[in-house]
């Protein structure tokens, strides 16, 4: 119980320093914390602000978020790389392939940089991103370009470039 209390206290300090305890723009503190938790799970530190922008762009366009990390959270498979088509059919409020909008709450405990990215996304028109190889995450607004990169990702996955828990 003491460890959880320490985590909550640390989160509140970091949220306050990131400006999340106050409602900012369209999102309240709970929603920003949820966005930050997805950013933390989906991206490398260098990509946090771009992942934040993708989330916002998808929400603004009324698109499903389709974030693998939210499905992994629902399945208790955090840290997985691969997401099966069957997994995207899971009936869960955290399945952002089936449910539009943000999941009902955070999927993890985000760090300060993810919190800052949730509040201050980078400018861009991206609505897709994919990590095609370790340390090679690409962002685009083109579904066609995303499709080409997805083929590259699958090839790299089969070649063992990722440590996957398939």
Language-model-derived ranges and their functions:
Residues 1-166:
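Bacterial extracytoplasmic/cell-wall-associated proteins, especially those involved in peptidoglycan
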């Amino acid at each position: 119980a003491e460890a959880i209390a320490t985590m909550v206290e640390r989160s509140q300090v970091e949220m306050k320093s990131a400006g999340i305890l106050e409602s900012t723009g369209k999102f309240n503190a709970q929603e920003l914390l949820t966005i930050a938790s997805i950013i933390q799970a989906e991206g490398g530190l260098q990509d946090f602000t771009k992942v934040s922008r993708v989330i916002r762009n998808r929400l603004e366009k009324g698109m499903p978020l389709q974030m693998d990390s939210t499905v992994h959270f629902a399945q208790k498979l955090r840290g997985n790389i691969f997401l099966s088509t069957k997994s995207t059919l899971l009936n869960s409020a955290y399945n952002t392939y089936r449910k539009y909008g943000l999941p009902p709450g955070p999927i993890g405990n985000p760090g300060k940089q993810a919190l800052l990215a949730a509040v201050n996304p980078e400018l861009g028109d991206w609505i897709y991103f994919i990590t095609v190889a370790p340390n090679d995450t690409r962002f685009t607004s083109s579904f066609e370009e995303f499709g080409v990169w997805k083929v590259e990702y699958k090839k790299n996955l089969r070649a063992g470039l990722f440590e996957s828990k398939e």
